[in-house]
Every structure is written in structure tokens, then in C-alpha cells.
Curated annotation (Swiss-Prot):
The lineage of its organism: Bacteria, Pseudomonadati, Pseudomonadota, Gammaproteobacteria, Moraxellales. The keyword Hydrolase applies. Belongs to the carbon-nitrogen hydrolase superfamily. Nitrilase family. It comes from Acinetobacter sp. (strain AK226). It catalyses: a nitrile + 2 H2O = a carboxylate + NH4(+). Its EC number is 3.5.5.1. Keywords: Hydrolase. This is Nitrilase. GO terms for molecular function: nitrilase activity.
Length: 21
């Protein structure tokens, strides 16, 4: 999921709950 690192970083700033999903 290294390619998702940037996506996750931007998403976690908007919705930290996404990481839990």
C-alpha cells in the first residue's frame, strides 16, 4: 500500500476514520 501512502495521508487529515475502515 505504499502507493496509497499519499492518498491515506490526505484522507487521514480529512477523515481519520478511514484508516479504521
Amino acid at each position: 500500500v505504499s502507493y496509497n501512502s499519499k492518498f491515506l495521508a490526505a484522507t487521514v487529515q480529512a477523515e481519520p476514520v478511514v484508516l479504521d475502515a
